[in-house]
A protein has these predicted regions:
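Glycine-rich FAD pyrophosphate-binding loop
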Residues: 36-56
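Core beta-strand elements of the Rossmann-like FAD/NAD(P) dinucleotide-binding domain
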Residues: 15-17, 209-219
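Glycine-rich Rossmann-fold phosphate-binding loop(s) that bind the pyrophosphate
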Residues: 23-25, 47
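Flavin (FAD/FMN) cofactor-binding and adjacent substrate-gating region
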Residues: 104-180, 184, 192-198, 203
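Extreme N-terminal leader/targeting segments of oxidoreductases
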Residues: 1-19, 34-38
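Dinucleotide-binding Rossmann-like beta1-alpha1 core, especially the glycine-rich loop
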Residues: 60-143, 275
Length: 316
């Protein structure tokens, strides 16, 4: 993956590309890899670095869809289980299994979650990782000694997937190159070029050199996440907005909170969301929040209210 050689190839290309993807996050990289692996002449351009925004700021989990079980969305649970199994088998060096404990503070909660996760195990079938286990109070404390033990009854342990989101994106970019495509970062789209009212080319700025040039293509895929409406309105100024933006924040704590490496899922918070405490690179990631935020920017900031929300629910 040599950026200079890629730009040279891009500038020397006379024929239109088959596919140009705008956006180098998980969605854009996935689209570009799919196209390149099917033999389409493909180029991806990203205005910043690969996975620079949402795609590198996740809770680092490959969900099997357990959160959708509560919503009754069985089809999405099945889809998530299949996707998790594919990643665990095909990208085993980036994805691994992770145990989670759901602590319970009433006897009925233990059976409520146990029965729900039993059904989840049945849905998973051969796609499951390990069977759900019911723990008594001491077994929970053995795994998570920092747990608030006041009124603690026990818990339920289930298994899910964990991955390095940014590394998987970088590997996907490399695989695009391996399949004959180009994935170029710090290439900002500055203008949409049309012929007879049809989009036929992009004008892009090489942020690192300051040089601009055009890229012609037969088709274009817009995968810029929260920035999608900006380009859509460059195309047609009165295009209706289609993106509703929100901000999800995490805080990072010391690994001493989860010394055994077992993650926690807190099923009840003050706003009804789930809260995860997940071991990660000798630290613990705690989150996430979900609040509306119309201030679209590359580097959002966590508010004091979000930190208070996480700490309040984490310390219960």
């Amino acid at each position: 993956m040599n950026r200079s050689q890629g730009i040279e190839r891009l500038q020397n290309e006379n024929d239109p590309w088959d596919v140009v993807v705008i956006g180098g996050g998980a969605t854009g990289l996935g689209c570009a890899l799919d196209a390149a692996s099917r033999g389409y002449r493909t180029v991806l351009v990203e205005a910043a670095d690969f996975a620079n925004a949402t795609s590198s700021r996740s809770t680092k989990l490959i969900h099997g869809g357990v959160r959708y079980l509560r919503q009754g969305n069985i089809s999405l649970v099945r889809e998530s289980l299949h996707e998790r199994e594919w990643l665990l088998s095909q990208v085993a060096h980036q994805v691994h299994t992770q145990p989670f404990i759901i602590p319970t503070y009433a006897w009925w909660e233990t059976w409520y979650y146990r029965i729900g996760l039993w059904f989840y195990d049945r849905l998973a079938g051969s796609l499951g990782i390990r069977s759900t286990q019911r723990f008594d109070k001491q077994s929970v404390l053995n795994r998570v000694p920092s747990m608030n033990e006041e009124n603690l009854v026990g818990g339920v342990m289930y298994w899910d997937g964990q991955f390095d989101d940014a590394r998987l994106c970088i590997q996907t970019a490399q695989t695009i190159w391996d399949n004959g495509g180009l994935a170029l970062n710090y290439m900002k789209v500055t203008k949409l070029l049309k012929t007879d009212g049809r989009l036929t080319a992009l004008e892009v700025l090489d942020v690192m050199s300051g040089k601009s040039f055009s890229i012609r293509s037969k088709s274009f895929i817009l995968a810029t996440g929260i920035f999608s409406d900006t380009l859509r309105q460059q195309d047609v100024s009165n295009n209706p907005l289609i993106i509703q933006t929100s901000r999800g924040s995490h805080i990072v704590g010391d690994e001493k909170f989860l010394p055994s490496g077992t993650a926690l899922m807190i099923p009840k918070t003050s706003d009804g969301r789930l809260l995860f405490l997940v071991p990660w690179l000798n630290k613990v990631i705690v989150g996430t929040t979900d609040i509306p935020d119309d201030n679209i920017r590359l580097e959002p900031r966590t508010s004091a209210e979000e930190v208070d929300f996480i700490l309040e629910n984490f310390s219960r």
